[in-house]
């Protein structure tokens, strides 16, 4: 019975791995792996340690707000590594049309947590033009928190329109299309454990 239990447990992760393309067997529309799984996880661990050091435990649970959908994996991994007390919530906004940022940010789903008198950490997948992050930071500051800081997985400096300061940054990357680790193209590739450069779609 013990052998059967171990065999069943071990086979589940193997099956999941087969459903995810390996870095050396990428789909034709993915050009290369930009950031590998191990590199991403190391950086997330480092960011969590920085956050733990910056927020005093005596000031209550940290409110971690992940921006859907792209930051949901980053938010989960980051939150799991935090040692200080925290609460996780999510918010959804829309600023992209046809894969390009429009500059018109709309709130699609708000958080349920009250931010007044609390430290808030906004977790975003990518800093592109800066419109979305600027909108969120300004909106959250109007809710009278103790502080609002930002954690961003990827930064594209070449795409900046607004000058924004990121408190906790994962990686700076070139101006290329990227998918994986929560980021998608047409709802595909979100669950890749790495981040890959995508060949630009035809006409883009």
Walk through the language-model features, giving the residues of each.
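PRPP-associated nucleotide enzymes
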Residues: 1-204
């Amino acid at each position: 019975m013990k052998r059967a239990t171990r065999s069943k447990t071990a086979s589940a992760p193997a099956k999941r791995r087969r459903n995810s393309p390996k870095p050396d067997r990428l789909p034709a529309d993915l050009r290369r792996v930009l950031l590998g799984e191990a590199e991403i996880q190391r950086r997330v661990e480092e960011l969590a340690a920085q956050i733990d050091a910056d927020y005093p435990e005596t000031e209550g649970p940290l409110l971690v707000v992940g921006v859907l959908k792209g930051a949901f994996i980053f938010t989960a991994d980051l939150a799991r590594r935090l040692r200080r007390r925290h609460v996780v919530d999510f918010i959804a906004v829309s600023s992209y049309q046809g894969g390009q940022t429009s500059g018109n940010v709309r709130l699609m789903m708000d958080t349920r947590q009250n931010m007044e008198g609390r430290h808030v950490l906004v977790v975003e997948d990518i800093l592109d033009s800066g419109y979305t992050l600027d909108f969120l930071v300004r909106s959250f500051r109007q809710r009278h928190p103790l502080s609002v800081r930002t954690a961003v997985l990827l930064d594209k400096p070449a795409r900046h329109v607004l000058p924004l300061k990121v408190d906790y940054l994962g990686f700076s990357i070139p101006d290329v299309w990227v998918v994986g680790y929560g980021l998608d193209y047409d709802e595909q590739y979100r669950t890749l454990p790495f981040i890959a450069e995508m060949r630009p779609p035809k006409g883009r």
